[in-house]
Amino acid sequence: MPSHPNRGPKGPTANPAPAEVRAAREAAGLSQTAAAALIHCTLRGWQEWEAGNRRMHPAFWELFRIKVAS
């Protein structure tokens, strides 16, 4: 159960699925290293999100989407 009503698979800023993270990065034409640097996280953290070993926090996902859109 999510600890907050806006988190989880159905909230407005839901945690993205690993495949969604990878697809967004590839669509932006970024390497994992560049994507991690773009949102100020570690390369290992980004790799964990894409592998499905950790869930990406909605704030990181939103920041990534904003930065690649501009």
What is each PLM-predicted segment?
Residues 29-47:
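Short alpha-helical DNA-recognition segment
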